[in-house]
């Protein structure tokens, strides 16, 4: 897939840019027919990214997960794992000695798209051949439908996560709840 638009933006902004080449697609779509290719792919992609981060001498990485990602992960965890869980805002990876932060956790996907449109930022489409036909897409569509049927439900789901005493999440504070009730 063509990353040229992102590369050009980074050059224009004078931001260092690295591409990590992997064989993840070959692993995921081999004859083994992985039962849960999305989960394995996510783990392998994060592993490759985190390894590059360490090679660059960094000890912290910011993932771009937004509020909708957190809600969708919670829905997936409830449906497929039977637990109330979503990834935490800050995670320390012991084996990598790397801190993962998610600074966009209070930003909705719609706000991200609005920012992208306002500033005419380039978009590189997901090259995955199953994009749009995944369990995550199912969760995204389900949350969208629930929010259409029950306006405000998505924000209430996020508030439930903030208040849910999920391992790795900070204790509930009014600051976190502000605007998400």
What would you call each of these model-derived segments?
Residues 121-181:
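The feature marks non-catalytic terminal segments
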Residues 1-74, 80-83, 110-118:
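ATP-dependent adenylation/nucleotidyltransferase module used to activate substrates
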Residues 22-24, 105, 128, 162:
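Residues that form or immediately flank small-molecule/cofactor binding pockets and catalytic motifs
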Residues 68-148:
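Catalytic subdomain that performs nucleotidyl-dependent activation
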